[in-house]
Regions:
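Charge-rich, low-complexity N-terminal segments
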Residues: 1-88
Length: 88
């Protein structure tokens, strides 16, 4: 079963450095886990949509909650989906 999760957070460090770090580490792992999505950042605030299998998305969101690069993480939306909106 596929799900889509949308969350917002604040960058713990300057956003440009944080985005580079997140992308460098997450892109290969997300591909291995079958996770797709989109990350948007402005004024030190992140908004990200994550899509994939329920277990993989839930696990990744748990990692994000524990990630020191994110502060004030807020879950905005979570739904079951039949197809991805953001493909690799």
């Amino acid at each position: 079963m596929l799900v889509r999760l949308l969350f917002a957070s604040r960058a713990a460090e300057p956003a440009a450095a944080t985005i580079a770090s997140i992308c460098q580490h997450s892109q290969p792992r997300n591909a291995e886990r079958g996770i797709t999505g989109v990350l948007v950042c402005g004024d030190g605030v992140f908004m990200q949509a994550i899509e994939g299998g329920r277990a993989a998305v839930n696990s990744l969101y748990g990692e994000i909650l524990r990630d020191a690069r994110h502060r004030d993480v807020v879950l905005l939306h979570y739904e079951e989906i039949t197809e991805r909106r953001f493909v690799g």
